[in-house]
Structure formats: C-alpha cells, structure tokens
Amino acid sequence: MLTTTVDGLWVLQAVTGVEQTCPELGLRPLLPRLDTAERALRHPVAAELMAVGALDQAGNADPMVREWLTVLLRRDLGLLVTIGVPGGEPTRAAICRFATWWVVLERHGNLVRLYP
C-alpha cells in the first residue's frame, strides 16, 4: 500500500508516463509536454516518495507501483465507491481491474492511497 498526496501521484505519473489514472476521483491527467519526469523529480514530494521506496535514487518508480498505475490506465472494469459521513468530506475510491489484476485508488481530500 502506498499513501501519498495528489501531488505525489502526479510525480509517479510523470516518472512512469501514465497519462491518466482516475478522472472520476477528480485527478488531473498528465500533460506529457509539460509534466516531464525531470520537472516532477524537482517537486518536494519526490523526496518523500524516495524515502518510502516508491522511487529509487535514480528517480525510477518501484516496479510494483508502476504495475498498479498501469492497471488504472488500462482498466477494463471500474467501480466507483463514495463513502460519506454526515458533516465530513466523503472518501471516494475506484476499484479497477485489468485482465486478472485488481487495484484500488482511494482519495480523501488531498490524500490518495494506492494498493492491490
């Protein structure tokens, strides 16, 4: 499981070249001409991703994280879930499948959680 911010997810998208994850969760698509890996690696959250092992020192994404993002990009089935509590901000989650692989991407405010 990886917990990061919306900006952290953007850094991972730029490094892996995954242009789109889940627009249903209000996540912006990657613009390859502007959102380059070099630019993303200069973002302060890149150091946090390196500290938790999502990125290596060369700026490459962990292979498992790359696979999770690929499932989101190439999904053939997706289920959107909204969990709300009165008076609180809802948590939204996309449960996505590609072939036999399943990945969940949750969003609560600025935090995102990605896991199989």
Functional labels for PLM-detected ranges:
Residues 56-103, 107-116:
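Accessory beta->alpha helical hairpin/"wing" motif in late/C-terminal subdomains of nucleic-acid enzymes
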